[in-house]
From Swiss-Prot:
Its cofactor is Mg(2+). This is CRISPR-associated endoribonuclease Cas2. The gene is cas2. Its EC number is 3.1.-.-. Mg(2+) binds at residue 14. GO terms for molecular function: metal ion binding; RNA endonuclease activity. Belongs to the CRISPR-associated endoribonuclease Cas2 protein family.
Length: 108
């Protein structure tokens, strides 16, 4: 039996914030992502590490269960190796990204 691979779920979203109710829905979605272990890469781009396909499916299902009514949300599932090969073209790594590499997990 093969060992489960570490993978990443990357969520990209564009949510309407014109009215107070829509801002509230967008904030609730962001709060869900943070509570479910996602880390913000950029504004409206969040990433979460998972181990194996079962965990990936579990978090994908949670994500789908917490979608707001409106907006555009995309999900990309990649291996940790693919994630580690991502190149930063402009700017600097966030403090957390410098401290946690693909061999480490963030524990709370």
């Amino acid at each position: 039996m093969s060992e489960a691979k570490f993978m990443r779920i990357i969520v990209f979203f564009d949510l309407p914030v014109i009215t107070a109710a829509k801002r509230k829905a967008a904030n609730q979605f962001r709060q869900f992502l943070l509570k479910d272990g996602y880390q913000m890469l950029q504004l409206s781009v969040y990433s979460r590490i998972v181990k194996g396909r079962d965990s990936l499916q579990k978090h994908h299902n949670r994500l789908c269960a917490n979608l707001p009514q409106e907006g555009s949300i995309r999900c990309l599932e990649i291996t940790e190796k693919q994630y580690a090969a991502m190149k930063l073209l402009l700017g600097e790594l966030k403090t957390q990204e410098k401290k946690v590499n693909s061999d480490q997990l963030l524990l709370f």
